[in-house]
Amino acid sequence: MRLILFFLLFTVMTKVLAQDLQDSSDTEFSIQKFTWSTASVGALSAGSLYGLGKLWYGQQSQISFHLFNDAKNWMQMDKLGHTFSCYHVTRGLDALFSWTGLKEKKSLLLAAGIGLTYFTGIEILDGFSESWGFSLSDMGFNALGVGLYVFQEHYLQAQIFKPKFSFHQTRFAIQRPEVLGSNFIESVLKDYNGQTYWLSFSPGQMGLDKWPDWMMLSFGHSIRGRLKGDAMSYGGITSHREFLFSLDVDLSRLNVKSKFLKGLLKSLNTLKIPFPALIYANGKMNARPIYF
C-alpha cells in the first residue's frame, strides 16, 4: 500500500516539473490545462484505488465494515507517514492546479479536497479488510498533513515548516523480513526502525536576516528495536523512541538557473539531506557524524 502512495506522490511531483518549465508570467486560466490535469489526477486516483482493491485487498479476507484502533502501533511512525504523504500530495496537487491558472484559493481547496478524499478511500478499503479496519487515528494524521500545508499556504503565504523523510538500513529487518522487508526497497517502505520523519525550517525564512534562507534546522522522530507493531518487546529486543536534531538544506531555495533542475530540486525537497545529528534516546544524548 505504501508503494502506491509514493507512486502517486512521484507522479504529482512531475507536474511540479511541468509547472517550472512554463513561463512564470503565464498565469492565465487555461481550460485545456485544467481539464487535462483533473482527468489525469482522477484516472490515477481511481486506477490506484481499483488496483489496491484487486491486487492487495483482494488477497485478504473481507468482512463487514468495521473500525480498528491501531493508534499505538509502531510508536506512531506509520501515522507520521500518513501526515508526510498527505502533506506532499496536497502540495503537488496545488502546484498542478496553480499551473493551470486556477486562482490561489480555489487551487488550494481543490488540492486539499482531492488529497483527503483519496486517502479516505484507502481507509475505507481498510475498513472492509479482516486484517485491518477503518482507523480514526490514520484519518486524524491524514487531516494533519493536509491541514499543515493549507494553514501555511493560506495564513503564512509560504511553506516554512516542511515535512521530510530519510532512511537507513537496520539489522532488525533481517530478524523479521516478512514484516520489515526482505530487500532494500521493501525495507524503505516497511522498516520503521530505519525511517525518520523530520520537520525542517529555516530561521532565515522567519525573519532572521543573517541566516541563509536555504540552511534549515531539522527536528526528527524515529524508533529503534520495534519488531512487532503492538509489542514493546519482541524476540528479546525492547524498542524505544529517538528524537533527533540536525541541519538540512532547502533545495527549493538554491540559486540555480536551469528551470528543469530547479523543478527537480523542488521535487527532491521531500528528502532530508544527510548531516551530523544529535540523538536523544532512553534519557541519553548521543551524536552521529553523519545521519541518514
Residue ranges and their predicted role:
Residues 147-151, 197-203, 245-251, 288:
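Residues on the lipid-exposed face of transmembrane beta-strands in outer-membrane beta-barrel proteins
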Residues 5-79, 83-90, 94-102, 159, ...:
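N-terminal targeting leaders of membrane proteins
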Residues 122-143:
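Interfacial helix-loop-helix junctions of multi-pass membrane proteins
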Residues 114, 118, 161-163, 213-219, ...:
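Transmembrane beta-strands of outer-membrane beta-barrel proteins
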Residues 176-178, 229-234:
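Outer-membrane beta-barrel translocator domains and adjoining extracellular loop/strand segments
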